[in-house]
């Protein structure tokens, strides 16, 4: 008998040990990410063919202390490799791990290769060749700290490669993990099984193979142990033949039904092809369908629902996924009372959207990603109970009620004002610390960074509830909900892009057509708190030469142009925003030489500018230290210097509309008087209804020459 290591994923060691015991192994001992045992050739052949959970089996030839490359070489060269494989066989070394002395796995593999080759040469035998592409033999080395395991891989390519899945959907599960999920789900071979998000069908195919008692390796054509010196072909042929007979008989005896749904027709075709290659196509019924609306099949008494829904990149906070899990949970309760469900996901927050209490849960890894598998018993409930539990105001009821109230008040006002975009919630309740803006049929939810004393998991769960409630209360489609995190921006971060979606839309504001981008930047291209300021600028602009500084996307310029300005000059440092401003003007038919656009540092431009203007709008940042600006700018510190330069450009009867977002900004009235300027605070007059709770969102001043 030889010593073996069955390799598996962390968390599956005990399950694999149970499986090996059922396959006739007497001393299966779980270790980290594996199971140790002794076996004859016949036993290990059977394990390789029948194990659903092991990723590979390694014949352990040596375990040793490895504190240097010489330790590695000596341990390798001391093994009689001639007894393992013939010199005509090609081999490769799979070296996993490093330590302080062996810092590179390629170097470790080279030392092992040297030891093996030298062993053959010492016996006056030809050197076996290396082949990374098509090796006959794979040498397995695992190094952790100063402990090393050296052996021969018995299988070759990982055992998850069953041979039925050459292609898959976007996020495939490994077959070994899929088998583990099925085994942990509580499903038994007599029960019907349904996967409402089946993708390429792996979960269903693995379950169907279990029900048919089909060996998972039965379709596999090549095994490394067939190239070893002690290979017993007659024994192996008998084991394979027995497995083939069992599989043929098993498929005919399966009584349970398997159902797979997916909303991607192309992926469903892949699933059907995979099932056909696996030999279980007649057992599985694949249909086009959505998990949020899936209905219970007729023959599904005591059935089990198992699935691996999408997780997303930013775990637990994608509006579309939150809506999917919420709707799926509602559908499970509405359609599948008396059944059980087992859901595998990396996001506990998303699983919470199911609104079901798990009876069992397990931790597993999907590759390097930690995941949860939760098992649920779905209670039988009346329609009234389901409606009451999952109604629009059942999630975060305080928040939902406030949002509903705000929508009634602000929505009516916005319609009257001819506004497509407005704020319906702005951290009204401290525990629900977000802002929510409507852009036509879209929602933008901006999460303010949670205080450091709020645990991250609690903040995530609360945000999940906010998104779920917002979708249900507003009726906005989940794929039209955009989530952003707003926190204090510093340095370059304040200008960084968030994504590359580049999906623009046109909104209406008091008759002006304005282009917004809800996805790519923290801000959308339109500061909603200034809608009344922009309208006033339009009313003041008739016949005026208008200057817009720190212009951003030029929305104020659009209002001025539509209001009858004789000319407009739009200045911003960002070429991206300046091009955006040009697009805004074009969308409103404001085209011509009288509309100028200048890419420049506004502060430097001001010092050199020579023109004269009747109306100037300036909305500088509170603070800026852009690498393209020579000096930093602080609006409180520098506003008088700013006014001095603006005065020079302002005609005798002209007006400056000066705004900024610094809370508690104080105009230096004494210095303004010395400059010969009058300043009047009009902040309360420029505050729209949707920002009425946030009195300090901006401050706004009308500045004129002192009469």
UniProtKB/Swiss-Prot annotation:
Chief subcellular site?
cytoplasm
Is Hydrolase given among the entry's keywords?
no
Main enzyme class:
transferase
Catalyzed reaction equations: guanosine(2445) in 23S rRNA + S-adenosyl-L-methionine = N(2)-methylguanosine(2445) in 23S rRNA + S-adenosyl-L-homocysteine + H(+); guanosine(2069) in 23S rRNA + S-adenosyl-L-methionine = N(2)-methylguanosine(2069) in 23S rRNA + S-adenosyl-L-homocysteine + H(+)
Keywords attached to this Swiss-Prot or TrEMBL record, sorted alphabetically, are: Cytoplasm, Methyltransferase, RNA-binding, rRNA processing, S-adenosyl-L-methionine, Transferase
Matching entries from InterPro entries are given as:
23SrRNA_methyltr_KL, DNA_methylase_N6_adenine_CS, RlmKL-like_Mtase, RlmKL-like_Mtase_CS, RlmL_1st, SAM-dep_methyl-trfase, SAM-dependent_MTases_sf, THUMP_dom
Q: Output the Pfam families linked to this UniProt entry.
A: Methyltrans_SAM (PF10672), RlmL_1st (PF22020), THUMP (PF02926), UPF0020 (PF01170)
- Explain the purpose of this protein: Specifically methylates the guanine in position 2445 (m2G2445) and the guanine in position 2069 (m7G2069) of 23S rRNA.
Q: Name where it's found.
A: Cytoplasm
Q: Which protein is depicted?
A: Ribosomal RNA large subunit methyltransferase K/L
Q: Which gene encodes it?
A: rlmL
Q: Which organism is it from?
A: Vibrio vulnificus (strain YJ016)
What are the EC numbers? 2.1.1.173, 2.1.1.264
- THUMP domain: residues covered: 43-154
């Amino acid at each position: 008998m030889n010593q073996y290591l069955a390799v598996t994923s962390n968390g599956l060691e005990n399950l694999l040990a149970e499986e090996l015991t059922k396959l006739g192994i007497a001393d299966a001992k779980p270790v980290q990410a594996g199971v140790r045992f002794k076996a004859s050739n016949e036993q290990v052949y059977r394990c390789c063919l029948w194990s659903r959970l092991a990723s590979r089996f390694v014949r352990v030839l040596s375990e040793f202390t490895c504190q240097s490359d010489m330790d590695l070489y000596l341990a390798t060269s001391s093994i009689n490799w001639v007894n393992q494989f013939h010199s005509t066989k090609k081999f490769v070394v799979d070296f996993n791990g490093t330590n302080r002395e062996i810092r590179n796995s390629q170097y470790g593999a080279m030392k092992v290769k040297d030891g093996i080759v030298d062993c053959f040469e010492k016996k006056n035998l030809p050197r076996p060749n290396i082949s990374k592409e098509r090796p006959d033999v794979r040498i397995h080395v695992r190094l952790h700290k100063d402990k090393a395991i050296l052996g021969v891989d018995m299988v070759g390519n990982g055992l998850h490669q069953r041979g039925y899945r050459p292609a898959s959907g976007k996020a495939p599960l490994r077959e070994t993990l899929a088998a583990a999920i099925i085994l942990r789900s509580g499903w038994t071979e007599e029960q019907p099984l349904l996967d409402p998000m089946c993708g390429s069908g792996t979960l269903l195919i693995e379950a169907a193979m279990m029900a048919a008692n089909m060996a998972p390796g039965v379709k596999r054509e090549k095994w490394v142990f067939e190239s070893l010196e002690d290979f017993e072909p007659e024994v192996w042929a008998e084991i394979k033949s027995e497995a083939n007979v069992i599989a043929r008989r098993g498929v005919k005896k399966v009584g349970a039904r398997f159902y797979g749904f997916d909303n991607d027709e192309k992926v469903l075709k892949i699933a059907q092809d995979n099932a056909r290659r696996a030999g279980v196509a007649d057992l599985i019924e694949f249909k086009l369908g959505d998990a949020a609306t899936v209905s219970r099949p007729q023959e599904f008494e005591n059935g089990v629902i198992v699935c691996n829904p999408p997780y997303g990149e930013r775990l637990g906070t994608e509006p579309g996924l939150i809506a999917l899990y919420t709707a799926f949970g509602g559908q499970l309760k509405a359609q599948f009372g008396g059944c059980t469900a087992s859901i595998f996901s990396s996001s506990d927050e998303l699983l919470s959207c199911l609104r079901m209490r798990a009876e069992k849960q397990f931790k597993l890894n999907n590759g390097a990603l930690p995941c949860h598998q939760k098992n649920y018993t779905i209670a039988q409930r009346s329609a009234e109970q389901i409606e009451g539990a999952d109604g629009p105001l059942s999630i975060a009821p305080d928040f939902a009620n406030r949002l509903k109230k705000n929508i009634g008040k602000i929505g009516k006002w916005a319609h009257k004002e001819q506004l497509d975009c407005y704020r319906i919630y702005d951290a009204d309740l401290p525990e629900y610390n977000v802002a929510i803006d409507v852009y036509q049929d879209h929602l933008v939810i901006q999460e303010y960074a949670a205080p450091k004393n709020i645990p991250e998991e609690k903040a995530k769960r609360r945000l999940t509830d906010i998104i779920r409630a917002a979708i249900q209360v507003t009726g906005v489609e989940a794929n039209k909900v955009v989530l952003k995190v707003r926190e204090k921006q510093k340095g370059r971060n304040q200008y960084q892009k968030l994504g590359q979606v580049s999906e623009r839309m046109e909104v209406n504001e008091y008759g002006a057509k304005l282009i917004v981008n809800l996805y790519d930047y923290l801000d959308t291209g339109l500061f909603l708190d200034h809608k009344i300021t922009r309208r006033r600028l339009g009313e003041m602009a008739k016949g005026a030469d208008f200057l817009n500084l720190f212009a951003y996307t030029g929305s104020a310029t659009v209002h001025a142009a539509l209001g009858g300005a004789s000319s407009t000059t739009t200045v911003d440092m960002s070429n991206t925003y300046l091009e955006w401003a040009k697009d805004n003007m074009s969308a409103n038919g404001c085209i011509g030489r009288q509309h100028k656009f200048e890419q420049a540092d506004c502060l430097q431009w001001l010092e050199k500018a020579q023109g004269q203007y009747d109306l100037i709008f300036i909305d500088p940042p509170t603070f800026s230290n852009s690498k393209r600006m020579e000096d930093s700018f602080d609006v409180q510190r520098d506003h008088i210097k700013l006014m001095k330069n603006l005065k020079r450009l302002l005609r005798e009867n002209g007006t400056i509309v000066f705004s900024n977002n610094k809370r508690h900004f104080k105009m230096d009235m004494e210095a303004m008087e010395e400059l010969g300027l009058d300043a009047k605070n009009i902040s309360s007059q420029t505050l729209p209804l949707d920002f009425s709770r946030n009195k300090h969102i901006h401050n706004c001043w009308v500045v004129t020459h002192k009469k």
